[in-house]
């Protein structure tokens, strides 16, 4: 008798995910004087989650949505919110919640996806997973600032204060859905005179990812900011592979080496013409020095061009 065994995906319902978030918020310690609050920390945070779920562009738009009685009932039933806070209270309360207390939620979701076999469709090159990292800003002002703000001064002397995060997400080409991991704040901290930066946040994020997912075979994907020796060394220490953009202006020695190898016909090349008469050009070479340092990492280089009517319409060196 023959048997065929299949790994069946276990469905994840919105209700089960919402329950996990709600329970986590209920267990968070409230930093406020509970005798003087009108809205529980749970209701404030769940309302914030609802705003993101409905994809409202602002707190004001979210509040306008809740002017409708049906929408209020949806918030209470779908998100288990008893008392709906006003926008100013939502802002004041959430601003004081440390992001670190929310990070376990990301790990919990990830493990649910693992147990339900949902991550298997994200595998690339056998059993690797591609994690893309990129920074984004979520607050900026020329007047309002705090001790954690990043300070940026323009050429004309205008000072701008910002808050940024470095976000990591598991993704795969062709898949519309991405799976976010816990982000890392880019912010100034007490006791450090030097301003925080994206690359330092990136190093912290790598350690966080490896600590949470120590068995996962990972490929980190990032822009040209990360294709420098200190970050690549950190990747290797974490046992991670990488695909990083390498701009010619940032890697003069690397480009000189590639140019010399190209003259010696040591660079592999493949050209493919598609049905639209566009020419796809691929070039690659393995095991070349990243820079001129004695302890330089040795890397692989790949470049792609798209040409149409003899003109390059797209290129990307990695």
Located regions from the model:
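Gly/serine-rich nucleotide phosphate-binding loop at the start of the catalytic core
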Residues: 2, 10, 16-85
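Active-site-proximal, Lys/Arg-enriched surface segment
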Residues: 91-175
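Short, conserved catalytic/metal-binding motifs centered on acidic residues
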Residues: 47, 62, 86, 90, ...
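Electropositive, glycine- and tryptophan-enriched low-complexity nucleic-acid-binding patches
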Residues: 153-217
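Domain-level cores of phosphate- or acyl-group-handling catalytic modules
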Residues: 192-253
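An anionic, glycine-rich sequence signature occurring as long contiguous blocks
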Residues: 247-318
